[in-house]
């Protein structure tokens, strides 16, 4: 679990997301509260439930990006799902319990990787010993007394020399033959949506077939060392302990990001009696968010302390269109602001992995130097903002379309301009995009 303070979390989010201070503070406090709860004594700890968050704002302003970046910072089981993927129990489609099943799978993978990192040093030593046994087979014990001891000393000295060369990478390209445990044969089962649990049970039933068999392979020492290290580390793990820790990690630290929650409101479903009831999905989500127990192949998982962050644009609906019980389960509401020209400008140039830096790096691979003048970036931001105002407002995603159109010619003929420097200023932007941006009909289809 992350031990970062709210200020540190916001500072990390600021490197990738422009503006939206209120939303950043809300998720930072929620994440920190997970750590605070763990420091509270046991009788009271069980009573402290997470305060779920509802993020409201137009598309393309950073709701999903905040969740994506939070996942990397959280160091906790995290799953992002679209609410529109689920259907009411009884209809064909995924049911909401699969959210917890996805979360526990992610947690098992995380826990296994963490446990393997703990034993990797010891596993590497054992893998080196196995490779040295292949390169330097133990000599047969011939003779007695001093001769045998002398032979052992020589053999140990040789092994240490080879171990040093192995660690320095001098033997990487040499090939060796070794017996590796054959992975259990995976079984692909085609099943209709909503029957994932049954499919998993059948797959796990067949997964043990053929496990434990050895397969002789000829590989380079560099690859052999990695394969043997993984094999030795896996032997040191206790699978039951990994599963127990994974379940506990989900129950105490799990985070679920529910995107597009506005698309399952009752208002969006008016007059569409033939469609699957979206209000039914809300009713199915309710016990999950309130706290229930879900049966998974790793055991029973309680959802009482899982943090839920929901988001939606709420263009056609309002948060009050959600069923009252579900509204009450998202006590913290944060409104995200629409992006201004200055925000677009900062997104283009001020973030750690800005679009400008990405395109400069891409074209640098073909020895084309791309320079963006300040007035060029400003003009790009103005055009993106203007097109959003005239047509559909898709937020920062408009920048992808605009900059792709701007650099279309340069990207196409980059091979012919190796060693050259291309400067993108306001004049260049107007020449490439001016006509399209001003013509509303053209910009509707091109930008």
From Swiss-Prot:
GO CC, any one term: HslUV protease complex
Major subcellular site: cytoplasm
Location of this chain's protein in the cell: Cytoplasm
Keyword Protease appears in the UniProt entry: no
Keyword set, alphabetical order: ATP-binding, Chaperone, Cytoplasm, Nucleotide-binding, Stress response
Biological process terms in GO annotation: protein unfolding; proteolysis involved in protein catabolic process
Gene3D superfamilies named among the record's database cross-references: 1.10.8.60, P-loop containing nucleotide triphosphate hydrolases
GO molecular function, one term: ATP hydrolysis activity
Function: ATPase subunit of a proteasome-like degradation complex; this subunit has chaperone activity. The binding of ATP and its subsequent hydrolysis by HslU are essential for unfolding of protein substrates subsequently hydrolyzed by HslV. HslU recognizes the N-terminal part of its protein substrates and unfolds these before they are guided to HslV for hydrolysis.
PANTHER family registered for this protein in UniProt: ATP-DEPENDENT CLP PROTEASE ATP-BINDING SUBUNIT CLPX-LIKE, MITOCHONDRIAL-RELATED (PTHR48102), ATP-DEPENDENT PROTEASE ATPASE SUBUNIT HSLU (PTHR48102:SF3)
Quaternary state and interactors: A double ring-shaped homohexamer of HslV is capped on each side by a ring-shaped HslU homohexamer. The assembly of the HslU/HslV complex is dependent on binding of ATP.
NCBIfam families in alphabetical order: hslU (TIGR00390), PRK05201.1 (NF003544)
Protein name: ATP-dependent protease ATPase subunit HslU
Gene source species: Burkholderia ambifaria (strain MC40-6)
């Amino acid at each position: 679990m992350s031990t970062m303070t709210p200020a540190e979390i916001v500072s990390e989010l600021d490197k990738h997301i422009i503006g939206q201070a209120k939303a950043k503070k809300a998720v930072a406090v929620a994440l920190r509260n997970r750590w605070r709860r763990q420091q509270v004594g046991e009788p009271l700890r069980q009573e402290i439930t997470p305060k779920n968050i509802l993020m409201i704002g137009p598309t393309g302003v950073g709701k999903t990006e905040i969740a994506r970046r939070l996942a990397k910072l959280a160091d906790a089981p995290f799953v992002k799902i679209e609410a529109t993927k689920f259907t009411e129990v009884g209809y064909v489609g995924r049911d909401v319990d699969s959210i917890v099943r996805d979360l526990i799978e992610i947690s098992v993978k995380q826990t296994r990787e963490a446990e393997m990192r703990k034993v990797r040093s010891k596993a590497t030593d054992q893998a080196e010993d196995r490779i040295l046994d292949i390169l330097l087979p133990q000599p047969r014990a011939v003779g007695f007394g001093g001769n045998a001891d002398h032979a052992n000393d020589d053999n140990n000295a040789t092994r240490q020399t080879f171990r040093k060369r192995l660690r320095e990478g001098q033997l990487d390209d040499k090939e060796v033959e070794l017996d590796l445990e054959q992975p259990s044969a995976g079984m692909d089962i085609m099943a209709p949506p909503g029957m994932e649990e049954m499919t998993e049970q059948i797959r796990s039933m067949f997964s043990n077939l053929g496990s434990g068999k050895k397969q002789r392979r000829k590989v380079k020492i560099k690859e052999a060392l990695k394969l043997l290290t993984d094999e030795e580390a896996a032997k040191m793990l206790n699978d039951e302990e990994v599963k127990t820790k994974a379940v506990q990690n989900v129950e105490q630290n799990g985070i679920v990001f529910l995107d597009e929650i506005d698309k399952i409101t009752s208002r969006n479903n008016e007059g569409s009696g033939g469609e699957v009831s979206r209000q039914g999905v809300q009713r199915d989500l309710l016990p999950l968010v309130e706290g229930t127990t879900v049966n998974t192949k790793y055991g029973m998982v309680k959802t009482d302390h899982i943090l839920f962050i929901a988001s939606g644009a709420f263009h056609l609906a309002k948060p009050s269109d959600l069923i009252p019980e579900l509204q009450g389960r998202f006590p913290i509401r944060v409104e995200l602001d629409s992006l201004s020209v200055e925000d677009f400008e900062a997104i283009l140039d001020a973030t750690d992995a800005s679009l400008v830096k990405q395109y400069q790096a891409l074209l640098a691979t073909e020895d084309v130097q791309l320079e963006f003048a300040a007035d060029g970036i400003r003009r790009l931001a103005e055009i993106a903002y203007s097109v959003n105002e005239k047509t559909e407002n898709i937020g920062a995603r408009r920048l992808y379309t605009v900059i792709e159109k701007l650099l279309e010619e340069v990207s196409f003929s980059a091979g012919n301009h190796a060693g050259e420097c291309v400067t993108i200023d306001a004049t260049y932007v107007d020449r490439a995009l001016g006509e399209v941006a001003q013509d509303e009909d053209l910009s509707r289809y091109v930008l």
